[in-house]
From Swiss-Prot:
SUPFAM superfamilies: alpha-helical ferredoxin (SSF46548), Nqo1 FMN-binding domain-like (SSF142019). This is Ion-translocating oxidoreductase complex subunit C. The keyword Coiled coil does not apply. Residues 645-658, 686-698, 725-738, 762-774 have a biased composition (Polar residues). [4Fe-4S] cluster 2 binds at C388, C417, C420, C423. Part of a membrane-bound complex that couples electron transfer with translocation of ions across the membrane. Its EC number is 7.-.-.-. It comes from Vibrio cholerae serotype O1 (strain ATCC 39315 / El Tor Inaba N16961).
């Protein structure tokens, strides 16, 4: 059985599934040789013209640069530098619209040419056989070369992935896209440089076989390559014209019958594929030292007066090429397509710049390429599935992409779609399937990047949390170790812990204060007991307001004790902090303490000896105020006695309806009333005698105020006596309000009157105190 390499050398070819045969229309632009386009007035250079990351800027606005001078630098293998296509001045660094299906804007360097074409210093390496593969890869990377067939993957990175494992090197010269002839004309005119580029790549990868795959619709290019590759160990294989045979996986299938595994790359199966445009750029970079600053662009379509291929400087606005090469827009449907009719996209405007992956500008008329705006519903014919070269299910992919069910799209291997457009070409409903796939891929890519960013943020947070916990544990261990070391050191020195010593000192000071606190507790308890007794007595006697005199005394006692404790604490603190105080200060402090103790003992004795019948404001009362209060109380007692006498005299005048009244009950009630009156008079006499024993609480009371208060009290007493006399004269004229009056009711009324008299006396006393305070 022949090996794979032997089968390839024998001329055997295979085929891939699906595929179509669209109208090629390549003859418009391949009959003219390549010419140089003029230098435009402005060059717009996007920082990112490849798959990967943009390089770091090396220039600023206002700098003058030379032709071939690096404008950015790379710091990773997925970065590529860009170079100045001509000499001039950097006029701006700003976002501009770039070649993208969505018309996105990216950061660009705007260069104003000076038309001098002054070159930067070049470093050619014509004897590349003496250089190592690593050195050659570095030179290729420095030249900024990427895949020029349309993908734009960094060439050096791709070659690096195939080091030491590439068995077959495949040169992609198929150029299957209709209208595009850039590679065809390049092979005709620069076949020698293409072969040089192949030899450089062979020196890097050292493959067992190199095979060039080219479609049979390029006979002139085949002849040029055969002539340039004479006596070279290369196989030039002409393959049938079929779209998309120029796809990497499809060309591998045709030439080797091998399939790239899902999610893998050709290097995984020992293969490496390179485009002829990339190889020509490699030869210029190594042999001549020129970086990638220009490329071949096909200008085709019926809107061009003379379609052809041109060398266009990178960054040249499309409008400059249109103006130079006779473009005349269609009046009803002006369109500019970057790329071919199958895989290209419509430009938003003509100021988009030429980049490393821009191989064609197609300007068709409305009759040449019809618009695809007439989308209709899918009729489920299945032609898209038959035409798919990757054996996908375009119909179901479109359904899920339209419904934004991107997880289903991934399950159906949407990422394997090469966006060749074969499905859309055969669709009778004119559904733009590729547009749905591109949008779905972009959304999936965006979500994937967001998920990766979230995972990175989560990992950073967890690492930070673990680090903080670790630092906290280390700090605690350090503190514990330091405390342990201190403790051991003090034990070794025969001392004790300073903190423990401080605690002991505080406890000792507290113990010194406790006896004083305990000595005053009995006095407080006695005062509380007296206050509770007076409250109980007031409740039994029916008083409406409780006697709070004892509580006032208790509050004063607590304040005094707090002041004494504060003074004692200050004395103890001063004694502990100033050990060198003299004997005089100590004697003075002791005398003050003894005086305060005697004063407290005297106050406790006085509060204990004070009678329980004292009025609520007896501690603060003035002797004159007490006399006034006694006079008021006597007047009210006389008034109450008169009312009782009237109430006992009324039963005799009652109507005949009270025949059941008992004379004995009336006599008993009268006796009770007289006894209560005598008791009230006795209490008044005692209260008048008490002022001499009361301790005045205010030494600054004004005698004039007391005299005024006494006069007011006498006036009120006279008014009360007059009212009593008038009320005593009216009973004979009064009409009894109740025919069933009972002597018991009269007694109850007398008791109520006495209670009201006592309440009025208390209120008048409190009012006098309030006026005195004011």
């Amino acid at each position: 059985m022949l090996s794979l390499i032997e089968q390839i050398k024998s001329g055997k070819l295979w085929d891939f599934p699906g595929g179509i045969h669209p109208f090629e229309n390549k003859h418009q632009s391949n009959r003219q040789p390549i010419i140089n386009a003029s230098i435009p007035n402005e060059l717009v250079l996007p920082l990112k013209q490849h798959i990967g990351k943009a390089g770091d800027l090396l220039v600023k606005v206002g700098d003058r640069v030379l032709k071939g001078q690096p404008l950015t630098q790379y710091t990773s293998t997925f970065m590529l530098p860009i170079h100045a296509p001509t000499s001039g001045v950097i006029s701006a660094i700003e976002p501009r619209t770039v070649a993208h299906p969505s018309g996105l804007s990216e950061l660009c360097i705007v260069l104003t040419p000076d038309q001098q074409e002054e070159w930067f210093e070049l470093q050619p390496q014509p004897d590349f056989q003496q250089l190592t593969p690593e050195t050659l890869l570095e030179l290729i990377r420095q030249a900024g070369i990427s895949g020029m067939g349309g993908a734009g993957f960094p060439t050096a990175k791709k070659l690096q992935s195939g080091l030491s494992r590439t068995e077959i090197l495949i040169i992609n010269a198929a150029e299957c896209e209709p209208y595009i002839t850039a590679d065809d004309v390049l092979m005709r005119q620069y076949a020698h440089e293409i072969i040089q580029g192949i030899e450089i790549v062979e020196h890097i990868l050292k493959p067992k076989l190199t095979i060039i795959g080219i479609e049979d619709n390029k006979p002139e290019a085949v002849a040029a390559l055969q002539q340039a590759a004479q006596d070279k160990p290369m196989v030039i294989r002409v393959i049938p014209t079929k779209y998309p045979s120029g796809g990497e996986k499809q060309l591998i299938k045709i030439l080797t019958n091998l399939e790239v595994p899902k999610g893998g790359i050709p290097a995984d199966i020992g293969l490496m594929v390179q485009n002829v445009g990339s190889l020509q750029a490699i030869a210029r970079a190594i042999v001549h030292g020129e970086p990638l600053i220009r490329r071949v662009v096909t200008l085709t379509g019926d809107c061009f007066r003379k379609p052809r291929n041109v060398w266009a400087l990178l960054g040249t606005p499309v409008q400059a090429l249109l103006n130079e090469f006779g473009y005349k827009a269609d009046k009803k449907l002006p369109r500019l397509i970057m790329g071919g009719p199958m895989m290209g996209f419509t430009l938003p405007h003509a100021q988009v710049p030429i980049t490393k992956t821009a191989n064609c500008i197609l300007a068709p008329t409305r009759n040449e390429l019809t618009s695809s705006d007439n989308e209709m519903a899918c009729i489920r014919c299945g032609q898209c599935a038959e035409a798919c070269p990757v054996s996908l299910l375009p119909q179901q992919l479109q359904w899920h992409a339209k419904a934004e069910e991107f997880d289903k799209c991934e399950e159906l291997d949407l990422k394997d779609c090469i966006e060749c457009g074969a499905c859309a070409y055969v669709c009778p409903s004119e559904i733009p399937l590729v547009q749905y796939y591109r949008q779905a891929k972009a959304e999936i890519r965006t979500r994937s990047l967001e998920a990766e960013a979230a995972e990175r943020a989560k990992a950073r947070f967890e690492e930070k949390k673990a680090r903080m916990e670790r630092d906290k544990a280390e700090r605690e261990n350090r503190f514990k170790q330091a405390a342990e070391d201190r403790r051991k050191e003090m034990q070794q020195q025969g001392g004790s812990d300073a903190i423990a010593a401080a605690i002991e000192r505080v406890k000792a000071q507290k113990a010194q204060l406790e006896p004083t606190d305990n000595s005053v507790k009995p006095a407080i308890a006695a005062a509380i007991a007296r206050a509770k007794a007076k409250q109980a007595e007031a409740a039994q006697s029916g008083a409406s307001e409780p006697d709070n005199s004892e509580m006032a005394k208790l509050r004063e006692e607590r304040k005094r004790q707090a002041r004494e404790r504060k003074a004692q604490k200050g004395e103890v603190t001063e004694a502990s902090t100033s050990d060198g105080a003299d004997d005089k200060k100590s004697a003075v402090a002791a005398a003050i303490a003894r005086a305060k103790a005697r004063k407290a003992e005297q106050q406790e004795t006085e509060s204990a000896a004070q009678p329980a019948q004292a009025t609520p404001s007896s501690d603060d009362a003035d002797p004159k105020k007490a006399a006034v209060a006694a006079a008021i109380a006597r007047a009210k007692a006389r008034k109450a006695e008169q009312q009782e006498t009237e109430s006992t005299a009324q039963p005799a005048q009652a109507t005949p309806s009270s025949d059941d009244a008992d004379p004995k009950k009336a006599a008993v009630a009268a006796a009770i009333a007289r006894a209560k009156a005598r008791k009230a008079e006795k209490q008044e006499t005692e209260s008048a005698a008490q002022p001499t024993q009361a301790t005045p609480s205010s030494d600054d009371a004004d005698p004039k105020k007391a005299a005024v208060a006494a006069a007011i009290a006498r006036a009120k007493a006279r008014k009360a006596e007059q009212q009593e006399t008038e009320s005593a004269a009216q009973p004979t004229q009064a009409t009894p309000s109740s025919d069933d009056a009972d002597p018991k009711k009269a007694a109850v009324a007398a008791a109520i009157a006495r209670a009201k008299a006592r309440k009025a006396a208390q209120q008048s006393s409190s009012n006098l105190n309030a006026e005195e305070k004011d």
